[in-house]
From Swiss-Prot:
Function comment: Component of the dark-operative protochlorophyllide reductase (DPOR) that uses Mg-ATP and reduced ferredoxin to reduce ring D of protochlorophyllide (Pchlide) to form chlorophyllide a (Chlide). This reaction is light-independent. The NB-protein (ChlN-ChlB) is the catalytic component of the complex.
Official protein name in the record: Light-independent protochlorophyllide reductase subunit B
Location of this chain's protein in the cell: Plastid, Chloroplast
InterPro entries in the cross-refs: ChlB/BchB/BchZ (IPR050152), Nase/OxRdtase_comp1 (IPR000510)
Biological source species: Isoetes echinospora (Spiny-spored quillwort)
């Protein structure tokens, strides 16, 4: 959650974390689903992609390389789906560089 907040990304819902049936109605509002652990949520993400055309990212953001790849995938979908809404494209390369520079 902190990493997404650092990138200026608002989280729609975290399911199943304390989720309720009432929160399920908000799922189609998301631009992309993040499935950090394939064991939990992948089938839901596949269903939402099939039913609502909502893409998902299933890379686990663990370690420098996979976290950078995860951020690049998020950047790709934001720039594909949202530039008309935001009025600009995002570039997270400087964030990735800053976070991995001294590792």
């Amino acid at each position: 959650k902190r990493l997404l907040a650092d990138l200026g990304i608002q989280i729609n819902e975290v399911i199943p974390e304390g989720g309720s049936v009432n929160q399920l109605k908000n799922l189609p509002k998301a631009w992309v689903n993040l499935v950090p652990y394939r064991e939990v949520g992948l089938m839901t993400a596949i269903y939402l992609e099939k039913e609502f055309g909502m893409p998902y990212i299933s890379t686990t953001p663990m370690g420098i390389v996979d976290t950078a790849e995860w951020i690049h995938q998020i950047e790709f979908y934001i720039n594909k789906l949202a530039p008309n809404i935001l009025g600009y494209k995002v570039n997270y390369e400087s964030y990735i560089d800053q976070q991995s520079r001294f590792v």
